[in-house]
Amino acid sequence: MAPIALAPTTNTRFVTKLKTSIVSPQPNTLHDVLAHAVERYPLHELGFITSSAHDSSIQTKTFSEFNQYVRNLARAMLEWGKPKGSVVVVYLTEHEDNMAAVWACLLAGYVPCLQPALSAQQAHKEAHVAHIKNLFGSAIWLTSEIGAEQISSISGLDLHLLSELKASAEKFNVAANWVAYEAKPDDEAILFLTSGSTGFSKAVVHTHRTILAACRAKGQSYGLTSESRILNCKPHVDLTLAFN
């Protein structure tokens, strides 16, 4: 029997479209972004500028390596015993450390807040830290040994060292898709502090939805593809996660 050519029907087109959407859904949360990046481009790299090096050298990690690293950090964070949604003030100087801490907080169910360099004036520094504590109703800080020295004289802070968190994370080897909880698009994702030029700093809340909307709009406007290279600058009120 000769083969019969059939024109695609509406149902056929619908099924084809449905299959495509199931195979490659649009990310709805930042958790999805990381998972999709690892699944589709495992060998693509993130480059981190090392500010402490004299030549500002760039260290790289593949998406797969970074994914495993931050998920292990996130699992180690749970050992702190903090409730879901707790705000963690991230006070670090190195590019990679900041990004790893932010992603680990997200995956652990915490809300990261990047803290810019504190004032060298003790009175200003103490006032700002006290304000942040009152603003968030907590005082969880993730920092380095140098950062801890700057704020160790301020009472009532729950300080955690990144070096100790890294050591704790070495005990874990979680699954490549491990998360402490499933995020929703309108969950708080990250907090940004304003400069405080008109008084004490205010916290700007960004949800998973708002960050992804900004990323999609910028990506379309600039014509970005999976081969694009992005220099991720970090102004105090910009989206640190935008193209990480």
Where are these regions (language model features)?
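ANL superfamily adenylate-forming
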Residues: 55, 129-130, 139-186, 200
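Conserved ATP-dependent adenylate/AMP-binding module captured primarily in the ANL superfamily
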Residues: 102, 118-152, 170-171, 214-231
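Conserved pre-ATP/AMP-binding loop-to-beta segment of ANL
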Residues: 42-46, 170-193, 199-200, 205, ...
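Conserved AMP-binding
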Residues: 73, 91-96, 102, 114-116, ...
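Short hydrophobic alpha-helices that are characteristic scaffold elements of the AMP-binding
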Residues: 78, 103-114, 135, 238, ...
